[in-house]
Amino acid sequence: MDTFQVIILALIQGLTEFLPISSSAHLILPAELLGWEDQGLSFDVAVNTGSLLAVVIYFRHELWNMFTAWIASIFKGKQSDDSKLAWWIILATLPAVFFGFMAKDFIETHLRSAEVIAVTTIVFGLLLWWADKMSHQDLTVYQTGWRKALLIGFAQALALIPGTSRSGATMTAALMLGLSRDAAARFSFLMSVPVSLGAAILVGKDLSESSLPIDYQALTLGTLVSFVAAYLCIHYFLKIISRMGMTPFVIYRLILGAVLCGFIFL
């Protein structure tokens, strides 16, 4: 890949990973418009690592408090709001892990298509709009509870379907269950840490077993660009939803889905 392609793809990954707009839908567009080939496993690992570092650094205080409280709950039996939140995040991760292993081959074979991505981009955009407008949103992230956490976890598993958007599915479920917009976004961001880490490890394992050449300069640039884009995305997204809600992202998803349908069916 040349430098321009690295920057564009890393920007797409960083900007769309944490927005409820589907990163897979956006990664189709460069291929359709510019004829770019698949970027390969090594680049996937690099840009995912950049996004993971962004959320870890942005929420470093919350994550550290959760980690220390979680350790205390195990070894000292001390329960706190942060330890409960840590356990809920772990619980919410389990459905995606289970269904990821069980349905990986089926998804890769039958659902990873432009048609599926176009349809899910529109359908789950409408669900996000409904959840944002119709649900009663007053719970904080510390009021989630294990039942709601598990249901949000199943929504995250549903996002294994390309075009759904992990952030979009989890935020939609959280809003439907009564979490505030800020709480829904924060819970979704925190949930991304174990999932992204696990995915990076699995893809990294596949990469280590591959004999393909590695362009370390491109990977370094991709990681850096993805990190900066994702960090800024998280910061400004939290500000936008506090003022405008999810409507801008719903409109964007509908337009994007229509554009994809145009490329596919016209």
Swiss-Prot record:
Catalytic reaction equation(s): di-trans,octa-cis-undecaprenyl diphosphate + H2O = di-trans,octa-cis-undecaprenyl phosphate + phosphate + H(+)
Record's keyword terms, sorted: Antibiotic resistance, Cell inner membrane, Cell membrane, Cell shape, Cell wall biogenesis/degradation, Hydrolase, Membrane, Peptidoglycan synthesis, Transmembrane, Transmembrane helix
Subcellular location(s): the record lists:
Cell inner membrane
* GO CC annotation, single: plasma membrane
* Domain of life, per lineage: Bacteria
Q: What class of enzyme is it?
A: hydrolase
Q: Which residues cross the membrane?
A: 1-21, 39-59, 87-107, 111-131, 149-169, 183-203, 218-238, 246-266
Give the chief site where it resides.
membrane
* EC number in record: 3.6.1.27
Q: Which GO molecular function annotations are given, in alphabetical order?
A: undecaprenyl-diphosphatase activity
Membrane topology, as annotated: Multi-pass membrane protein
Q: May I ask which residue range the UniProt record assigns to the signal sequence?
A: none
Any one of the GO BP annotations:
regulation of cell shape
**What is the stated purpose of this protein?**
Catalyzes the dephosphorylation of undecaprenyl diphosphate (UPP). Confers resistance to bacitracin.
Concerning its family, UniProt says: Belongs to the UppP family.
Q: Further remark, if any?
A: Bacitracin is thought to be involved in the inhibition of peptidoglycan synthesis by sequestering undecaprenyl diphosphate, thereby reducing the pool of lipid carrier available.
Protein's name according to its UniProt entry: Undecaprenyl-diphosphatase
Species for this entry: Shewanella sp. (strain W3-18-1)
- Gene from which the chain derives: uppP
